[in-house]
A protein has these predicted regions:
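Aromatic-lined carbohydrate-binding/catalytic grooves of carbohydrate-active enzymes
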Residues: 187-340, 352, 361-372
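Carbohydrate-recognition beta-sandwich/jelly-roll modules
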Residues: 1-240, 284, 490-493
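Active-site-proximal substrate-binding groove within the catalytic cores of carbohydrate-active enzymes
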Residues: 97-102, 107-153, 212, 306-319, ...
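Structural alpha-beta junctions
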Residues: 36, 51-54, 234-237, 280-282, ...
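Short acidic, gly/pro-rich beta-turn/loop elements at beta-sheet edges
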Residues: 38-40, 52, 251, 295-297, ...
């Protein structure tokens, strides 16, 4: 079996490695000590998952939250190649028509990509491990589990069993039995209310007190209480509310600054009244936070805690949002400088349940090259998992979006597993499949995709997909707040009038 080293300077080297037999099939790997310096990426066992046009079977390819998981059948098609640089599930599969194999990545998981390729009728699927010229932080290792069952659900079942036995996951029912806060939340529908925000994307890249755009109030704390009352009148028993934009200057207003509570919504006094009221109605209530980005308009902004590149520059994020230009926070410094105190302060307001931390399981894990707090991707994953474990301890649960499964053992709910389930398919996509759902149903709660939130007001296809793929009901007020970016669907829930709450 072959591996290929592609170096930063353009050199390419190939070598053979020997597989090691195991009860489940075999495993193969490369010790980190045997990986030379200066490697850009490693193409691993590129000669193993191979087929020819006309063969029976398929490739199973988890591409990431943008595209979900696809099947590629071995039919005649033009030459093409696709590189998925961010793979949110740590596996990939091959069915020959007679047997199936799933590769489970157990070493260098956080630096995993997948390459799909067709050239002159020959199909290839292999993992690519990104080293970026740095030393490998751990061994590259992949286990190959074989089965005579050729259905993709069998491969999902193998990965599910692996995650439950070796991946640290436990069933939701077991966790809920051990923590009444999680039990209460897991029994409830999720209701997400976007309360306040500045224009997004912001017309002002670098904001300060003089040029900061005004906050738009979408739902005051008093009005949120009226939404809770309306739910109670309809005899809805189990709900967990999540407030987005409760913090100073609203959604993504001045992160990592949270306080004071946004005054235009009613401030801290009205927020505490709301929390007490909602809990008095028998409902849960949590809030939306962030642990990855810093806006220069924050009163605590400091380049000290930002991610540094190899060139010692700070790492700006590509998405311009309500607070203007965000910069990536070093995961270690986020935990040390902000999360412990922030969660304590948020809990003191009264929030309890499945706490939401934005984007933590949908973004590629950053490397930090600051000599005072350097972090490779494996270390970054551990710092983020510390945040998740702290969230569970303080509030009762942790949630984010998309479900990048380096964090599967510490995640209770994901807002959506990927974006659209059905969209224009590319040359290598023949079918979308619910791999995340088959693996994690009953372990992690989820909404199937962005287009199945608010499913009662969506079209028939979205409603059916919601039930078929086993979602946690999710209602979102003011989902479409960003100009021209209705990525949660065109349909929305509004709260301006009493009629809209009926």
């Amino acid at each position: 079996m072959k591996v290929r080293y592609v170096y930063e300077d353009g050199r390419i080297a190939e070598r053979e490695i020997e597989p090691v037999k195991a009860e489940y099939g075999f495993w193969a790997g490369i010790s980190s000590e045997n990986l030379p310096s200066g490697i850009k990426h490693v193409d691993f066992l590129y000669d193993y998952f191979c087929a020819n046009a006309g063969d029976d079977g398929y490739f199973l390819v988890p591409r990431g939250p943008e595209d979900g998981t696809v099947l590629t059948y071995f039919k005649e098609r033009e030459n093409c190649e696709r590189e998925s640089t961010f793979v949110h599930l740590g596996c990939y599969g091959f069915c020959s028509g007679k047997e199936s194999v799933i590769g489970i990545v157990t070493g260098m998981r956080c630096s995993l990509g997948l390459i799909e390729r067709v050239y002159n009728g020959k199909y290839e699927l292999f993992p690519r491990f990104y080293l970026d010229g740095d030393a490998a932080e751990e061994d590259i290792r992949v286990e190959f589990h074989k089965t005579e069952n050729t259905d993709y659900s069998a491969l999902a079942g193998i990965y599910r069993e692996y995650q439950l036995t070796a991946g640290g996951c436990t069933p939701l029912s077991q966790r809920a039995a051990e923590d009444p806060r999680l039990k209460k939340a897991s029994d409830g529908i999720s209701v997400r209310i976007r309360t306040a925000w500045k224009p997004a994307p912001s017309p002002v890249l670098f904001q300060n007190e003089e040029n900061e755009p005004d906050v738009k109030v979408g739902c005051s704390f008093e009005r949120a209480g009226e939404i809770a009352d309306a739910c109670k009148r309809e005899n809805i028993e189990n709900l967990e509310f999540c407030l987005v934009g409760w913090n100073y200057k609203g959604h993504d207003g001045r992160f990592p600054q949270l306080f004071p509570v946004e005054p235009t919504l009613g401030g801290e006094t009205e927020l505490k009244k709301l929390i007490t009221k909602v809990q008095g109605l028998g409902y849960g209530i949590v809030c939306h936070d962030d642990a990855t980005q810093a806006y220069p308009c924050a009163d605590c902004f400091d380049e000290e805690y930002l991610v540094k590149t190899k060139g010692a520059t700070v790492l700006a994020q590509p998405q311009i949002w309500s607070g203007g230009q965000p910069f990536k926070i070093c995961p270690q410094r986020e935990y040390e400088r902000f999360e412990i105190e922030n969660m304590k302060a948020i809990r003191a307001l009264g929030f309890e349940g499945i706490h939401y931390v934005d984007v933590l399981t949908i973004v590629q894990l950053p490397k930090c090259y600051d000599p005072h707090h350097s972090s490779n991707r494996t270390q970054t994953a551990e710092w983020y998992r510390k945040i998740m474990k702290l969230s569970r301890k303080v509030f009762g649960g942790f949630s984010s979006e998309a479900g990048f499964d380096y964090a599967a053992a510490f995640t209770d709910y994901v807002l959506y597993t990927n974006f659209k389930i059905e969209k224009e398919r590319d040359l290598l996509c023949d079918e979308y499949i619910p791999l995340f759902q088959l693996v994690y149903h009953g372990i992690i709660m989820y909404n199937p995709c962005t287009y199945t939130l608010n499913y009662p007001v969506k079209g028939a296809q979205q409603r059916l997909k919601f039930f078929e793929w086993g979602g946690r009901p999710l209602a979102v007020f003011n989902a479409n707040f960003a100009d021209g970016q209705h990525w949660m669907g065109e349909e929305d829930l509004f709260n301006e009038t009493d009629e809209q709450l009926k």
